[in-house]
């Protein structure tokens, strides 16, 4: 639907989400990163701006859903579990299924390859899938996911969040690269 995302916090990851939306085909979006960097918030805002129907599961908060996903012996049973716990009708071509805290059910990551091949729904997975936790995934379906790693705010994002304009950011970065002091009042504003 290409709506403008109305988020309070401008993040560079949004550009990567939009690129996935524009070209994803048979690929899920897998958003990873440390805890508390804004993954869930940013994904949720993006999806609600882009899709008519958003189904969201939190595998930490929803133990019954996690148990159902864990009990699924194949992709058909996993999809039936998704459908049963969705809480609303799944509309092919208009629904995105967002599975948050996916590190709690590694089989969902492995099964995503088969879910996206069905081509009826879009899938977004999110979680703190760092190093050790990824080792528990039997097979990361590399060709079937677009991985976006999120990090804490970088300098530019921090400036955006504090209302600093792009021209001021560019000048500040130029001063840094040229190893010259930032104009006094601007320096004070940035502090």
Please identify what each model-predicted range represents.
Residues 1-191:
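Phosphate-binding site recognition
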């Amino acid at each position: 639907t290409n709506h403008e995302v109305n988020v309070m916090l401008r993040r560079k990851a949004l550009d990567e989400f939009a690129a996935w939306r524009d070209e994803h085909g048979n690929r899920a979006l897998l958003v990873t990163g440390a805890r508390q960097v804004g993954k869930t918030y940013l994904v949720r805002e993006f999806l609600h701006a882009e899709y008519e129907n958003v189904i969201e599961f939190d595998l930490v908060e929803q133990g019954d859903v996690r148990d159902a996903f864990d009990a699924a012996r194949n992709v058909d049973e996993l999809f039936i579990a998704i459908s049963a716990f969705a809480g609303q009708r799944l509309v092919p071509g208009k629904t995105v299924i967002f599975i948050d805290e996916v590190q709690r059910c590694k089989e969902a990551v492995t099964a995503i390859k088969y879910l996206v091949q069905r081509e009826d729904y879009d899938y977004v997975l999110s979680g703190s899938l760092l190093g050790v936790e990824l080792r528990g995934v039997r097979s990361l379906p590399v060709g079937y996911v677009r991985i976006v790693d999120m990090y804490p705010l970088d300098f530019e994002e921090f400036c955006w969040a504090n209302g600093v304009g792009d021209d001021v950011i560019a000048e500040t970065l130029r001063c840094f690269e040229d190893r010259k002091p930032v104009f006094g009042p601007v320096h004070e504003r940035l502090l």
